[in-house]
Each structure stands twice: as structure tokens, then as C-alpha cells.
Amino acid sequence: MQTLDHDHVSVHIDAPPEAVYELIADVTRTPEFSPEILRCTWLDGATGPAVGARFEAVNKVSRGPSWKNRPVVTAAQPGREFAFSRTEKFSGTLVWRYRLEPGGSGTRLTESYEVIRPISRLGWFIIDRLFGCHDRRAELRAGMDQTLQRIRETAERDITPGHTPPKTATTA
């Protein structure tokens, strides 16, 4: 049986932390970056990142059907940190976190996950058989690498010096 506990990946981005934060905290843009996310929409009147805000994510791996989950934002500190927790039936609870640190000519961005409640045996069976994910840890790490590279490319292409990010929205 597979195990999953935590992992992280980092990248340097030539853009200010506040501007990078605006990219990652706008969950509606997540499909541009993540190879597993098809769609994200804010729920319950939320229009942007705020602690307690919920959103619906539609995920899909290369094999198997898509599925929905409803994460809750647990940290929303512009220019510093964006995090959310998601619980799925049989698949435990994971906290996904983006930490931003000023560094050199830009930002060191770290994406990580931590398993808070482990995936059940039935969950691993489903992951292995239905989705064909025989090494979920490696797939998640590869996905984080790809996500961070896409964020870096977007930030370095679209964000100019002196950029002033828009104000962060709150829940309704």
C-alpha cells in the first residue's frame, strides 16, 4: 500500500512576492498552472482569498474520471502565504500551502502538502485501481514541479517592475 505524508517543491521567480501571491491566491486561475485541476470556482459568495472561504475544485489525473472537492482557505496573507485544506471521502485530509519569501531579484515560492488525516485503505485501492496511480507521491511531486514552473513562466512574462496588485477580495 502507498503512503503519503508530506512533500514540498520550491522555485525562484523574478517577480515581487505580492504579485506572485495574486496569481496563486486567485484559485480561478489554478487550471492555468496545475496539471490536475480542470476548474476552480469560489463558493458561498466568496470572490477571492480569505480565511474560511470555500471553493470547488474539479480534479483529473491522466487516467480515470474527474472528481470534485471543496477546499477551505486556511491562510491568506498577501505576499507571504496562501493555504487551503481539503477533505475527501476515503482520501483523508490534506493541507496545501504556498509560502512566498522575498529573495534576491524576486520571490522564492514553495508549494507543499501535508497529510493531516491519512488516506484510508479503500481510498488507496480506488487511487490505485480506478485512477491507475501506482506512485501517488511521485505524481504529486511532478505536478508540483509543473505547477511552479507554470507560475514562474506566467509571473515573469506578465508582471512588470512596479506592478501594483489588486486588493484582495473577501468572503461575502
Mark where each language-model region is.
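Short, surface-exposed coil-to-beta transition loops
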Residues: 6-8, 66-70, 92-96
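Beta-strand/loop substructures that line and gate deep hydrophobic ligand-binding cavities in soluble
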Residues: 86-142, 151-153
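Short, cysteine-centered beta-strand-loop-beta hairpins and adjacent loop/turn segments enriched
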Residues: 61-67, 117-122
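Hydrophobic ligand-binding cavity/cleft-lining segments
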Residues: 1-51, 147, 166-172
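Short glycine/serine/proline-enriched coil/turn segments at secondary-structure junctions
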Residues: 49, 62-65, 90-92, 147
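Short beta-strand segments that buttress and anchor functional surface loops
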Residues: 54-61, 82-89
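A short, structured loop/turn motif at beta-sheet edges
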Residues: 17, 47-49, 74-80, 99-108, ...
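Charged phosphate-binding loop/patch that engages nucleotide di/tri-phosphates or the phosphate backbone
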Residues: 148-166
